Amino acid sequence: LSSAFAAMAPAAWAEEGVQAWLLRMQQAQQAVPYQGVFVYERESNYATYRVWQGERDGHVVQRIQDQEGDPHELLQQDGRLICNSRGQHVSLLPRLPAEEHVARLVESYELRMVGRSRVAGRVSTVLALIPRDKYRYGHEWHVDAQTGVLLKAVMINDDGQLLERLQFSHFSTEAPAEPALIPQGPCETMAAAEPVVTPVLAPMPQWLPPGFIEVRRQQVPNVRAELAVSSVLFSDGLSSFSVYSEPMGQQLAADARSQLGPTVAVAHRVQSEQGDVMVTVVGEVPLVAAERVALSMRVHDHATASEVTHD
């Protein structure tokens, strides 16, 4: 590290651990007003976005606007995506570990304070989250020293290959005016999925990567049929994947897998006496993890996530 960086860094850096920084990032995500421009990279494709975060009607609102191509906007309120001009349940900024999950990250990742950097002209501290196995990706986060806002995020695979990068090129702590927090064009409202009770006959994984637990079970609309598709979300506190289950009936479908950047999808037909079910594992985990989860799926009476193994 250069002496210049060392001089600009707060003395408290030497005393604060990685977990303290993660908690500060989580708090900043919901408390710090800011605006800026960031670049998003995936699969050697680049896109530029403007972002505004501030308070409106007692809520923390974050608006993201695509600066290239067809107009595209996303709006989040209190951390929940409430509208997307493309009608997709996706968000661009990295999901940070919830406060209650920070302590257990050490089970799945080695947490390191790497050093200091400058991003968008601001002094940042660099955190590394190194996976302890092959079932999750590695992360490098550059956190603004003054605010705790994440200014740069890099995701890499087991071979050190870049999968995804987000980096601010301009960042200001000036609170945005209220009009900047309102979408300027059509922005389709995102309906919340309905929570459901576990069906009597539910495909459940018999294996999960170490550290992953079930965190949410819900129903999502099925555009091809009247029956809803059940969805179960699993997370290790940082990485996550969902398992979608759809009764097949007389439909014909083959197993398949795909990957785009860090996001993988593995579809596998699960046979049972009560009828076949197509399960699809989707998430930002290595393909080896998604495939093993999909192949472990079984239909059992009153299946629960507590019955799985993590070896």
Question: Which positions does each model-derived feature cover?
Answer:
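N-terminal leader/targeting segments and the immediate start of mature chains
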Residues: 4-59, 104-108, 116, 253-311
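Short, hydrophobic/aromatic-rich segments at coil-to-beta transitions
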Residues: 31-37, 57-63, 121-128, 149-152, ...
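An acidic-aromatic
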Residues: 43-100, 152-169, 173
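A short, surface-exposed beta-strand/turn
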Residues: 55, 75-76, 140-152, 249-252
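Short, solvent-exposed recognition patches
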Residues: 91, 188-274, 285-288, 292
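Intrinsically disordered, low-complexity linker/loop segments enriched in Gly/Pro
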Residues: 91-139
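Gly/Pro-enriched, hydrophobic low-complexity segments
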Residues: 120-186, 259-260
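Short, gly/Ser/Thr-rich active-site loops of penicillin-recognizing serine hydrolases
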Residues: 174-200, 303-311
